[in-house]
């Protein structure tokens, strides 16, 4: 006979599988196949796209964790679905694995924010148009900045050295104060600005020393996200990241970049004032 592999467990997302829906899908697939075709259930793709396991996420509340399924958990889901799919339909609903799974989907997730809902409901067509227009902004920027036709600059993010990573780790472990950490980052920014000025770049950047992974850093300044401890996934090559999980309505609870954006020009002004003296 022939084998048909059915990718019934999503290998790319991190969410728990709904057994009721998946068992209905498996039943439909089997009914559509000839008798000489054996259906083998599988994940929809390799599990390299998802974190390894939920076992070590001890800082994530169980009320959140029950909704997730990483690589190991997806394999457990496959095993349980395989057993349930072989049982008669009237027997499935009495199985503990099925009962426990369906409990998760019976309650609505608490993930909504009334203010976000209201703002979305009141969006108007003109809100999608940025003013002034791009052509006007270009003219204003050219007049104000006085840059050459092809200005020299760098990519915004400078290397995160082992010293910077060590300082950030010490701050997260409460081994140094927020003030000590802030002053350290300010010095890195000031040195970065000074170096760019010395080599004659036209457009300076502040180096982005204040952040770790960009997505994680910005996510921490927003509501509506959850954060994991060990849920690493591959970004590219040997680089791995822990992306925040979009849990509910996302909104900005505080300024994200204002403090550093304000400090960088100040450090440049101090540098130029010192050179003038």
Regions found by a protein language model. Name each.
Residues 1-275:
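Domain-level signal for soluble alpha/beta catalytic cores
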């Amino acid at each position: 006979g022939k084998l048909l592999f059915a990718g019934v467990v999503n290998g790319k997302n991190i969410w728990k599988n709904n057994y009721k829906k998946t068992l209905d899908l498996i039943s439909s697939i089997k009914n559509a196949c000839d008798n000489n075709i054996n259906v083998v259930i599988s994940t929809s793709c390799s599990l390299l796209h998802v974190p390894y396991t939920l076992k070590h996420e001890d800082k994530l509340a169980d009320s959140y964790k029950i909704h997730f399924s990483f690589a190991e958990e997806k394999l457990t889901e496959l095993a349980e679905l395989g057993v349930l799919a072989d049982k008669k339909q009237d027997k499935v609903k009495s199985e503990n694995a099925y009962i426990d799974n369906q409990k998760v989907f019976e309650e609505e997730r608490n993930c909504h924010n009334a203010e976000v809902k209201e703002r979305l409901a009141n969006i108007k067509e003109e809100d999608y148009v940025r003013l002034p227009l791009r052509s006007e902004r270009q003219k204003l920027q050219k007049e104000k900045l006085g840059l050459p036709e092809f200005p020299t600059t760098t990519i915004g993010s400078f290397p995160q050295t082992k010293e910077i990573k060590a300082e950030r780790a010490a701050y997260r472990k409460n081994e140094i104060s927020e003030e000590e950490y802030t002053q350290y980052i300010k010095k890195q920014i000031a040195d970065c600005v000074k170096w760019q000025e010395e080599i004659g770049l036209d457009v300076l950047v502040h180096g982005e020393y204040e952040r770790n992974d960009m997505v994680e850093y910005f996510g921490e300044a927003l509501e509506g996200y959850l954060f994991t401890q060990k849920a690493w996934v591959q970004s590219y090559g040997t680089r791995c990241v822990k992306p925040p999980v979009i849990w509910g309505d996302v909104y900005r609870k505080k300024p994200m970049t204002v403090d550093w954006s304000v400090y960088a020009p100040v450090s440049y002004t101090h540098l130029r004032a010192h050179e003038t003296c």
